[in-house]
């Protein structure tokens, strides 16, 4: 059996092991209208303001939700920016690339904002926002590294999976070099191990464009 999922070692030790938010946990916003009151969960209300969130590990389910939200917002208004808030330790490379490809394909600019931690695929998506609109809050942390993975089974199966991980590593490094302006050699060197940056260091590196002190 082959484990094809590329994983990131900074797991929930960087984030609390929180349960999935249910109806009794998510804050609810009540709006008044001529037809009476309407209740929205907070994320649905923010979606109306074109604000979406990546606040967990990256997986296929999260990718499907974010892709759907971006496509919906593009259909609503193909010109107005979409804001993507990121607080994620990373996760599946293929799921992350699905989000990334959609960010590049939709017409609206994607404003990325790091709050908390953007690590591994989270940092990659942060850097993949529209140029000049990649932001971070002052006490957030950003980390880049190479994809990890594991395989088991016959030797030939392990070899196939190793080649796939190397392919994904090359793909991510090339894209990071494109988005940061760093050389491919430097990206390869810096991602060989966990490479943590402060927001200001991320600006100097080219991962983001600005540290913001106010959300207004």
Swiss-Prot record:
The active site is at 120 (nucleophile), 145. Pfam families: CLP_protease. GO terms for cellular component: cytoplasm; endopeptidase Clp complex. The keyword Hydrolase applies. CDD domains: S14_ClpP_2 (cd07017). GO terms for molecular function: ATP-dependent peptidase activity; ATPase binding; serine-type endopeptidase activity. It is found in: Cytoplasm. Fourteen ClpP subunits assemble into 2 heptameric rings which stack back to back to give a disk-like structure with a central cavity, resembling the structure of eukaryotic proteasomes. Cleaves peptides in various proteins in a process that requires ATP hydrolysis. Has a chymotrypsin-like activity. Plays a major role in the degradation of misfolded proteins. Belongs to the peptidase S14 family. This is ATP-dependent Clp protease proteolytic subunit 3. It comes from Prochlorococcus marinus (strain SARG / CCMP1375 / SS120). The lineage of its organism: Bacteria, Bacillati, Cyanobacteriota, Cyanophyceae, Synechococcales.
């Amino acid at each position: 059996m082959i484990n094809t999922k590329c994983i990131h070692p900074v797991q929930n030790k960087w984030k609390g092991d929180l349960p999935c938010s249910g109806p009794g946990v998510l804050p609810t916003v009540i709006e008044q209208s001529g037809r009476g009151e309407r209740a929205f969960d907070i994320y649905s209300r923010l979606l109306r303001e074109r604000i979406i969130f990546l606040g967990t590990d990256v997986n296929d389910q999260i990718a499907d939700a974010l892709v759907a939200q971006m496509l919906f917002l593009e259909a609503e208004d193909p010109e107005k920016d979409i804001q993507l808030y990121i607080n994620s330790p990373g996760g599946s490379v293929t799921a992350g690339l699905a989000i990334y490809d959609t960010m590049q394909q939709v017409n609206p600019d994607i404003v990325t904002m790091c709050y908390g931690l953007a690590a591994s695929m989270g940092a990659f998506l942060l850097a993949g926002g529209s140029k000049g609109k990649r932001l971070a809050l002052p006490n957030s942390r950003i980390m880049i590294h190479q994809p990890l993975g594991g395989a088991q089974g016959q030797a030939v199966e392990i070899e196939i999976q190793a080649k796939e991980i190397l392919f994904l590593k090359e793909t991510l490094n090339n894209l990071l070099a494109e988005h940061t302006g760093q050389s491919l050699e430097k990206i390869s060197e810096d991602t060989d191990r966990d490479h943590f940056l402060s927001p200001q260091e991320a600006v100097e590196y080219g991962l983001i464009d600005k540290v913001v002190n106010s959300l207004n």
